[in-house]
Amino acid sequence: MTQALLGRSAAELQDWAVAQGQKPFRGRQLHDWIYAKGARSLADITVFPKTWRAALVEAGVDVGRLKEVHHSVATDATTKLLLSTEDGETIETVGIPTDQRLTVCVSSQVGCPMACRFCATGKGGLQRSLQTHEIVDQVLSVREAMDRRPSHIVFMGMGEPLLNSSAVLEAIRCLNDDLGIGQRRITVSTVGVPKTLPQLAELAMQRLGRAQFTLAVSLHAPNQRLREELIPTAHAYPYDALLEDCRHYLDVTGRRVSFEYILLGGLNDQPEHAAELADRVGGFQSHVNLIAYNPIEEEEFKRPTPQRIEAFRRVLERRGVAVSLRASRGLDQNAACGQLRRQQMAPNTPS
């Protein structure tokens, strides 16, 4: 396997260059070429002597970029990339543009073990977790494909980030320090893994010096019974325990928790569900992000009507819960929330 340089800090690259018998400035050049100029391989870094570049490649060292397999653009300009890893696995990442920002939805694993019924990613199971450079590459690949600097990052692609917390936190450090994306513009989404939330804040403080990224917890139901129907792994994490761990995260970091809630027509979208949800999450600083269901082939769930969605939102609002509705982006290219999977679609835009 290639020894990847992507994902390393400026200090680490400088130390690495010195260990290779080079001057410290070579490490600074390497950092600039990898992060600012977007070098895909050592061959691109023309300021380095050819003999040294060749020797490094011979020794199994390279930048560590992924290969773009497919590139599709939705009618709303949302861009989905299918990327291939060195061992032949594939992952998807999505660039979501607006006039003011470019959000990159990154994957943290190849596949996902959580098997949420409404999500396409979990249908294929988990292959492995991604390494730090494979996570960071997704942001660089979207920047390259869309010719625009990403402003926000959401760990809402393939995989459960808290089952790969070490690589995810190191990727956050890299995105923050090396690509200049503020932690407050980074969101880490989790469906909830027992014992990981209490550790996350402490680990982030150790690894990052602070924990300023947003934690988004996927609830998708107002009670334990319904949550277990939608999320098979929820049986191991009682609803009350999950909320208590969210309160602990808030106490340690001072950062409010965002709760994700996918609305499924006739299943969890009734006014009584909204009232019950308000009773559960209204007791501490939080925010509810409503997401209308995005269809996948394997399930027959229905997307609620706009009227039903608005009624649900109003119940939460009247009960004092901060709430917003996430717009679905990239639907016509299966690039919306819950639709990512490891597959190549018919050609759309050449890579």
UniProtKB/Swiss-Prot annotation:
It is found in: Cytoplasm. S-adenosyl-L-methionine binds at G159, E160, S189, S218, L219, H220, N294. Signal peptide: none annotated. Its cofactor is [4Fe-4S] cluster. Keywords: 4Fe-4S, Cytoplasm, Disulfide bond, Iron, Iron-sulfur, Metal-binding, Methyltransferase, rRNA processing, S-adenosyl-L-methionine, Transferase, tRNA processing. [4Fe-4S] cluster binds at C112, C116, C119. Pfam families: Radical_SAM, RlmN_N. Belongs to the radical SAM superfamily. RlmN family. Reaction proceeds by a ping-pong mechanism involving intermediate methylation of a conserved cysteine residue. This is Probable dual-specificity RNA methyltransferase RlmN. It comes from Synechococcus sp. (strain CC9605). The gene is rlmN.
